[in-house]
């Protein structure tokens, strides 16, 4: 789990010099650390064992004077600092929520429209709404006529008054608290909506047809009109079964899909999830997807035996193309863990996949996530959180990250960075192997921001201490103070530090 060096170069604003001091590998840490208190150095990371910890490097010497420019600290990308919150978004949003950030103060949620006072779970009957008389309303950030609704912090725009089509609807927010309903965005046959992306001013809304099969797509250039966009038909021909796909656009404009692959598992016995996730890429996100190596592959040993399972929807929903509900899979042993209902996001070049986590042994389902420094590399397991079948999605909004599920509890996080890290750098100015001047102790941390034109690519500013006031010297030393200030299991785990020098 390494941060891409290429991205670090970008955030420095210049090329890493050969003379820069980088502590990255397990060997680097062992060779350069002078003392560690309240932490352990394991597998190339410094992990606190107490609430507070300190790390001091040895003095890095040189034969000529050098001026330090900056210190950058990278943490483990495991991203465990999530905080539970009550249901995110409209209270009457049904089924799996789909999130889409168009830009600052422009956040969207898609789901089924329920005429009930609480979000219903898939398969549950909605409670009938009481009698209500709508009244005109005003809301900051909206210049269209609005009406009140029986749901708290929710309003109807003109598009929201148009009749439903049986598919997903759109709600918009400027603050992730108040939501304006703009009406349908997919037809009834597209009720199994799984993901959305933003491409050149248009929303790509992906859905399975039939359920758990080939991803199709609506392209919508007007989310406000209460009318579904243009149905472009099948986007990805699923070579297996499973879909429940998540889509993400890279910075070159290519669209990637992460898709469930049920070929190694009896999915009906494992919450319709799988240990295997396929990955395909397309230039436009509408067609031409080419499959790559799997994004997730936690299969156990294949037995060579073939089993079958039954799906309830294929023949019913698409009898033209599906003559049977029976599918085959290769039996694997021992029992496998299963993942699915994928959602993707990229933070400063580090990719994350969030999805269902159904552990082996019949334990409680939860949200699980994986990470990789490249969308083209296999993802590594991070952790899990919550309870129940989540069907999650993730978005960046209002300066933080929101993880929405179809359960009663959602989650929010300031980002992968875990507070608190304080740093100072010292310099030996007279070549006596002693530090003559230190900087003040300064708290450093990463920050995150939108990238114009991209919904799921998030910019990262590194945790950096600028050292322009430090004089030239023959030796430099780094000291770090770590304090676990969170109320969850996360802690500031150091993975890499870089002391850059002026040329």
What positions do the PLM features span?
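Blade-edge beta-strand/turn elements of extracellular beta-propeller
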Residues: 79-88, 176-187, 223-238, 284-334, ...
């Amino acid at each position: 789990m390494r941060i891409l060096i290429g991205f670090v170069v970008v955030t420095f604003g210049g090329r890493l010099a050969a003379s820069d001091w980088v502590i990255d590998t397990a060997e680097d840490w062992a060779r350069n650390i002078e003392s560690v208190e309240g932490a352990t150095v394991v597998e190339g990371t410094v992990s606190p064992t107490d609430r507070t910890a300190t790390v001091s490097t040895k003095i890095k010497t040189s034969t000529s004077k050098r001026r330090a420019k900056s210190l950058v600290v990278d943490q483990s990308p495991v991203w465990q600092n999530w905080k539970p919150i009550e249901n995110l978004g409209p209270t009457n949003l049904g089924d799996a929520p789909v999130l889409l950030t168009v830009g600052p103060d422009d956040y969207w949620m898609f789901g089924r429209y329920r005429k009930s006072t609480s979000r219903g779970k898939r398969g549950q009957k909605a409670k009938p709404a009481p009698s209500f008389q709508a009244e005109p309303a005003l809301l900051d950030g909206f210049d269209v006529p609005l009406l009140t609704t029986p749901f708290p912090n929710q309003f109807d725009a003109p598009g929201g008054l148009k009749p439903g089509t049986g598919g997903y609807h759109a709600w918009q927010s400027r603050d992730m608290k108040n939501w304006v309903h703009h009406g349908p965005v997919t037809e009834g046959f597209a009720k199994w909506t799984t993901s959305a992306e933003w491409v050149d001013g248009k929303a790509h809304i992906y859905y399975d047809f039939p359920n758990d099969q080939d991803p199709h797509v609506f392209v919508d250039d007007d989310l406000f009109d209460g009318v579904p966009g243009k149905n472009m038909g099948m986007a990805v021909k699923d070579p297996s079964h499973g879909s429940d796909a998540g889509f993400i656009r890279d910075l070159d404009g290519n669209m990637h899909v992460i898709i469930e692959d049920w070929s190694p598992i009896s999915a009906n016995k494992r919450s319709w999830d799988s240990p295997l996730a396929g990955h395909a890429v397309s230039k436009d996100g509408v067609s031409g997807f080419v499959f790559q190596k799997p994004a997730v592959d936690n299969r156990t040993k294949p037995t060579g035996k073939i089993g079958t399972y039954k799906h309830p929807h294929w023949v019913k929903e698409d009898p033209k193309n599906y003559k049977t509900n029976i599918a085959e899979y290769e039996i694997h042993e021992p029992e496998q863990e299963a993942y699915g209902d994928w959602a993707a996001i990229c933070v400063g070049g580090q990719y994350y996949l969030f999805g269902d986590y159904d552990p082996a042994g019949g334990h409680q389902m939860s949200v699980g996530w994986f990470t990789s420094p490249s969308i083209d590399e296999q993802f590594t397991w991070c952790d899990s959180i919550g309870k129940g079948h989540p069907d999650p999605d993730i978005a960046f909004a209002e300066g933080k990250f929101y993880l929405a599920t179809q359960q009663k509890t959602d989650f929010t996080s300031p980002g992968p960075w875990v507070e608190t890290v304080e740093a100072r750098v010292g310099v030996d100015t007279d070549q006596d192997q002693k530090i003559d001047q230190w900087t003040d102790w300064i708290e450093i941390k990463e920050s995150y921001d939108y990238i114009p034109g991209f919904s799921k690519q998030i910019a990262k500013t590194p945790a950096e201490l600028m050292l322009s006031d430090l004089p030239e010297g023959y030796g430099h030393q780094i000291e770090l103070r770590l304090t676990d200030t969170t109320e969850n299991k996360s802690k500031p785990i150091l993975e890499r530090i870089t002391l850059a020098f002026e040329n």
